[in-house]
Amino acid sequence: MLFLAPGYIFPHVATPVTVAIDFAQAVKEGAYSFLDLKASPVPNPELFQPPSRVSIGMTGGREERNEEIIRGPLNYLLSLPGKDIRGKLIDALNEWFRVPEDKLSTIKEIIVILHTASLLIDDIQDSSQLRRGNPVAHRIFGVAQTINSANYAYFLAQAKLADLNDSRAFDIFTKGLLKLHRGQGMELYWRDNLICPTEEEYVEMVSCKTGGLFYLAVQLMQLNSEVTVNFSSFINLLGIIFQIRDDYMNLQSGTMTKTKGFSEDLTEGKFGYPIIHSIHAAPNDQQLIQILKLKTNDEVIKQYAVRYIESTGSFIYCREKLDLYLQEANETFQGLELLLGPSKGIRAILNFLRTR
């Protein structure tokens, strides 16, 4: 997830040099992979005036080269194709919202930047080796440079809010990032202290971590739309389905093995959904907890762990819960269609989430 909650948009510098920040081309080329919050005015609305360029304290002719260096890890990950489920969701929702194209492009850029930055930090926090089938950024650029690039990216995304010309966007953005950090913080706490959460605690965490970024996009879209329907429940459901499916695929999918490594959640010591169920299904058996504690790369041990999870009925349970959540999401979707009309894009996303 995310690493640093951002503050104000433009730092005050003695001799600022204007550097254009434009991710639109990357978005167009597809080069990258819940709570209702009442918005309030930003501390200083003047910070939101166009043009949407970032002033940074660098002088002379080196700023362009320096910008490439600073953004190196970010640009590296942007260049690796991903599923782009968030971009597809934004496009699908816009069948209802009808956000103007320029505003929609800005919102996509913001979400792409935030998601990519969060992956840079995720991979460091999880000691990951692969991302999208390639070496993680910090193995190439180093940990310190990657952290700095990710943090820099949060402010790039924040600066893009000016293009929306709505001071409420700052409040939505800030509260959204706080929520994302809360979810990530709890997941890291459970992992590092070897505390297995309950299913309810897991769902609450996912609502912050995964569903939170989905809903941030929705809130920014609704600033530029006449549609005022509350989407929080539906988006929350999509986030839960997406994360449970991801946890399931991590332990069961050959495709996931190629892109992230075999059963990477076991190596990370992560309490994914099937693992949580398996531990609670046999609370007096310490085998799985001990394997998580090892954070092992040993495939023999990980294969045994997968068989153990299977033996507790946890994969069956996971599939059954996914079906229930998908049924609820489909019923909610049908209600939204009655209000707003059909959406082929949302239906396609729901169909995608059914595949395993």
Swiss-Prot record:
Its cofactor is Mg(2+). Pathway: Secondary metabolite biosynthesis. Mg(2+) 1 binds at D122, D126. One of its GO terms (biological process) is isoprenoid biosynthetic process. PANTHER family: GERANYLGERANYL PYROPHOSPHATE SYNTHASE, PYROPHOSPHATE SYNTHETASE ATMG, PUTATIVE (AFU_ORTHOLOGUE AFUA_8G02400)-RELATED. PROSITE patterns: POLYPRENYL_SYNTHASE_1, POLYPRENYL_SYNTHASE_2. Dimethylallyl diphosphate binds at R131, K209, T210, Q243, N250, K260, K270. Pfam families: polyprenyl_synt. It catalyses: isopentenyl diphosphate + dimethylallyl diphosphate = (2E)-geranyl diphosphate + diphosphate; isopentenyl diphosphate + (2E)-geranyl diphosphate = (2E,6E)-farnesyl diphosphate + diphosphate; isopentenyl diphosphate + (2E,6E)-farnesyl diphosphate = (2E,6E,10E)-geranylgeranyl diphosphate + diphosphate. Mg(2+) 3 binds at D246. Isopentenyl diphosphate binds at K83, R86, H115, R132. Binds 3 Mg(2+) ions per subunit. Mg(2+) 2 binds at D122, D126. Its EC number is 2.5.1.-, 2.5.1.1, 2.5.1.29, 2.5.1.10. One of its GO terms (molecular function) is dimethylallyltranstransferase activity. Keywords: Magnesium, Metal-binding, Transferase. Geranylgeranyl pyrophosphate synthase; part of the gene cluster that mediates the biosynthesis of the indole diterpenes penitrems. The geranylgeranyl diphosphate (GGPP) synthase ptmG catalyzes the first step in penitrem biosynthesis via conversion of farnesyl pyrophosphate and isopentyl pyrophosphate into geranylgeranyl pyrophosphate (GGPP). Condensation of indole-3-glycerol phosphate with GGPP by the prenyl transferase ptmC then forms 3-geranylgeranylindole (3-GGI). The keyword Metal-binding applies. InterPro entries: Isoprenoid_synthase_dom_sf (IPR008949), Polyprenyl_synt (IPR000092), Polyprenyl_synt_CS (IPR033749). Gene3D superfamilies: Farnesyl Diphosphate Synthase (1.10.600.10). Belongs to the FPP/GGPP synthase family. This is Geranylgeranyl pyrophosphate synthase penG. The record marks Y154 as: Important for determining product chain length. The lineage of its organism: Eukaryota, Fungi, Dikarya, Ascomycota, Pezizomycotina. It comes from Penicillium ochrochloron. CDD domains: Trans_IPPS_HT (cd00685).
